[in-house]
Amino acid sequence: MAKEKYDRSKPHVNIGTIGHVDHGKTTLTAAITTVLARRLPSAVNQPKDYASIDAAPEERERGITINTAHVEYETAKRHYAHIDAPGHADYVKNMITGAAQMDGAILVVASTDGPMPQTREHILLSRQVGVKHLIVFMNKVDLVDDEELLELVEMEIRDLLSEYDFPGDDLPVIQGSALKALEGDSKYEDIIMELMDTVDEYIPEPERDTDKPLLLPVEDVFSITGRGTVASGRIDRGIVKVNDEIEIVGIKEEIQKAVVTGVEMFRKQLDEGLAGDNVGVLLRGIQRDEIERGQVIAKPGSINPHTKFKGEVYILTKEEGGRHTPFFNNYRPQFYFRTTDVTGSIELPAGTEMVMPGDNVTIDVELIHPIAVEQGTTFSIREGGRTVGSGMVTEIEA
């Protein structure tokens, strides 16, 4: 019998497992793929065992090595891409670099332990990098005889989530055992199916990139005699059409306005360019020296130039090619946003004297030129052209 072909009509959602080491994230990932393969067999739903997920391949994202396992599966309603990272450092890097863009996550907490230090850290990181929807899976309930103890652990988790501005009282908490489900215990398999129903219902469908406001980072600029100035780059999000009014934002204090008079891709004229396309846009009324690499072309009013922001950053270790020594307050590296480097100074949090290679920390940054940034914009920190850190804007300050 022919395998059914990949069904693009199902909404696609990115999720992941987060939580403290050894609380069962990878076992749960294996259980989800295995139970779905048993209950909803399809070409997509293939069982993955613990070992294959745990042997996550190394990837490089903006100069940083990260181990990440990607599995896919589907429910009756949706297609999921699921990210699981084996080590704690891999999670931190994944989230801060934006390598793992999760629409929602399953927070795994062992009922035998309750919340632990990394549970807290992963909740904080989720809050910082904009993962808005968490579902709790209390794992290993088969090892706890005392019903009251389970209630206490659940209360503790809910309080912790509320502390970081998640709706701790209202978000779903599912109690089960990933290992028992993996072993084929039907009671615990049912709970995995209940978990997936909850993920279907509770984590909203993400807004498609093409529905977001236009953002096109300018990579190159040239002029075509008799026609005007062309800016080229890859459309980050949104759509650009001929006759659109746009704004040119960043590097300079003032925002310039222009009208798109042509869109082309691979030297062919288009009516519109979509998120992901590499395009050249012809701009009316803009001189060759009025637009430069590092600026962005954006939907009017959608993004502004800023010089001050808070960021959550990960600093590379020496082994990853980063610094060999710590840095201190007023460290002045380059911040690489999309297509350009801008010098900026770093202010450390009160009470933090220095930042060591391998640390993650919240910093205040002040750039020497304004750049088009918003909450969620990612950046690299560089010194003399080599990457020494990676970060994400968590709050705009000026």
Swiss-Prot record:
Stored SUPFAM superfamilies: EF-Tu/eEF-1alpha/eIF2-gamma C-terminal domain (SSF50465), P-loop containing nucleoside triphosphate hydrolases (SSF52540), Translation proteins (SSF50447)
Region (G1): 19-26
Principal subcellular localization: cytoplasm
Positions bound to GTP: 19-26, 84-88, 139-142
Residues reported in the UniProt entry to bind Mg(2+): 26
Catalytic activities: GTP + H2O = GDP + phosphate + H(+)
Cysteine pairs bridged by disulfides in the record: none
Region annotation (G3) ranges: 84-87
Domain tr-type G: 10-207
Segments for region (G5): 177-179
Primary enzyme class: hydrolase
Annotated spans, G4: 139-142
One term under GO cellular component: cytosol
UniProt entry keywords in alphabetical sequence: Cytoplasm, Elongation factor, GTP-binding, Hydrolase, Magnesium, Metal-binding, Nucleotide-binding, Protein biosynthesis
Region (G2): 63-67
Subcellular location: Cytoplasm
Enzyme Commission number(s) of this protein: 3.6.5.3
Pfam families referenced in this protein's UniProt entry, alphabetically: GTP_EFTU, GTP_EFTU_D2, GTP_EFTU_D3
Similarity comment text for this entry: Belongs to the TRAFAC class translation factor GTPase superfamily. Classic translation factor GTPase family. EF-Tu/EF-1A subfamily.
Known partners and oligomeric status: Monomer.
Purpose of the protein: GTP hydrolase that promotes the GTP-dependent binding of aminoacyl-tRNA to the A-site of ribosomes during protein biosynthesis.
Name the record gives this protein: Elongation factor Tu
